[in-house]
């Protein structure tokens, strides 16, 4: 893990509980997870289409919350895109919207800006879940989630 572990240690003393690829928000009793995909790091437009890119972004977050026992309900989407890829960006956003609706996830906000490469970051927030009902990787069994 290296630097990822070091970064997590810096923030792990905050009021929320960080672990297993998502955090637990004590005050609202919700799980939250975020993932980012970057063009030419996580995918290349020559090999992945708009539907595959949208699927990768959503599923990486969805599985983090679901495997912890939660149900993703809300999302915040941040998109950075090159001006010459406007149509492709809109197509990816349409695919994200379709898949989100299929999974009962409401995109409630986010941000857009221009950049040299396409970058998308999605944060998903779960329904309420009691702390005692969270499934931890260390104690998970087949059929838990």
PLM features: what roles do these ranges have?
Residues 37, 71-145:
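Glycine-rich anion-binding loops of enzyme active sites
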Residues 5-7, 15-20, 57-60, 101-106, ...:
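Short amphipathic alpha-helical surface micro-motifs
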Residues 1-49, 68, 73, 77, ...:
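Extreme N-terminal cap/leader segments of soluble proteins
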Residues 48-52, 56, 87, 134:
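Residues at secondary-structure transition points
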Residues 7, 59, 64-67, 114:
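Hydrophobic side chains within alpha-helical segments
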Residues 53-65, 95-99:
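Short, well-ordered amphipathic alpha-helical segments that serve as non-catalytic structural scaffolds
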